[in-house]
Amino acid sequence: MKKIDAIIKPFKLDDVREALAEVGITGMTVTEVKGFGRQKGHTELYRGAEYMVDFLPKVKIEIVVPDDIVDTCVDTIIRTAQTGKIGDGKIFVFDVARVIRIRTGEEDDAAI
């Protein structure tokens, strides 16, 4: 099993969620996050004054999937989250040693 963390632009969340549902993903955790990478933030004009915005709003999607659909999920996220502009985000893939569904005690693939 693998855990996929995807940091994407907030306006792409619905597209990514729907596309992942089409490939069989039935659940995910979504968190509003802030961060910066190469784009380093930007300036905004507010009431006539310029302000530097160091951290940009992003959304973090976390899913745990069986090994055989990792590439499909990663490709789906890339295809639907990509705008071609700086700040599209990142995808991280981690090994998962064990998963337990608290309600039933099911483990591993049965728990995801």
Curated annotation (Swiss-Prot):
The keyword Membrane does not apply. Homotrimer. This is Nitrogen regulatory protein P-II 1. Pfam families: P-II. The modification O-UMP-tyrosine is found at residue 51. InterPro entries: N-reg_PII, N-reg_PII-like_a/b, N-reg_PII/ATP_PRibTrfase_C, N-reg_PII_CS, N-reg_PII_urydylation_site. Belongs to the P(II) protein family. One of its GO terms (cellular component) is cytosol. GO terms for molecular function: ATP binding; enzyme activator activity; enzyme regulator activity; identical protein binding; small molecule binding. It comes from Escherichia coli (strain K12). The gene is glnB. P-II indirectly controls the transcription of the glutamine synthetase gene (glnA). P-II prevents NR-II-catalyzed conversion of NR-I to NR-I-phosphate, the transcriptional activator of GlnA. When P-II is uridylylated to P-II-UMP, these events are reversed. When the ratio of Gln to 2-ketoglutarate decreases, P-II is uridylylated to P-II-UMP, which causes the deadenylation of glutamine synthetase by GlnE, so activating the enzyme. Keywords: Nucleotide-binding, Phosphoprotein, Transcription, Transcription regulation. GO terms for biological process: regulation of fatty acid biosynthetic process; regulation of nitrogen utilization. Uridylylated/deuridylylated by GlnD.
